[in-house]
Regions:
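Alpha4 helix (beta4-alpha4-beta5 surface) of REC/receiver domains from two-component response regulators
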Residues: 69, 90-107, 114, 118-121
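Acidic, metal-coordinating helix/loop segments flanking the phosphotransfer/catalytic sites
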Residues: 12, 37-55
Length: 129
């Protein structure tokens, strides 16, 4: 899927590693999206409560609030809000008995830009694509 294959979106990227946030922001900005970043779940939730985002992309393990906790808090406010998780722990989480509540797509780190584009296309509601 090419960058022009879907509309441009407002995306919130959450990761405690600034380099990861910057890399994902650069990839998504290259595709024309408007991207904001946060470095923990609590800061992300505060941003989410102030602004409207078409998509939230979050890491799993972060200080203050994990990504699954952030997703649950977001879905409690807006059940239709798409949330994608990017994590180095994808295989462990998928094998776990505990379901990832509120996660619409899971991407394993490291990942390719194409994986991210596909997750965006899959998770956004049809009327937005």
């Amino acid at each position: 899927m090419t960058a022009d294959a879907y509309p441009k979106r407002r995306i919130l990227v959450v990761d405690d590693e600034p380099l990861v946030c910057d890399a994902v922001k650069m990839m998504l900005t290259f595709d024309g999206h408007v991207v904001q970043t946060a470095h923990n779940g609590a800061d992300a939730l505060a941003l989410f409560n102030k602004e409207k985002f078409d998509l939230v992309i979050t890491d799993f393990l972060m200080p203050v609030m994990r990504g699954d906790q952030l997703a649950a808090a977001i879905k409690a406010q807006n059940p239709k809000q798409p949330v994608v998780m990017i994590t180095a722990h994808a295989e462990t989480l998928q094998a776990s008995q505990t379901p990832l509540t509120g996660i619409d797509a899971l991407i394993s780190k490291p990942f390719l830009l194409e994986n991210l584009r596909e997750a965006i296309a899959r998770t956004l509601p049809v009327e937005q694509v």
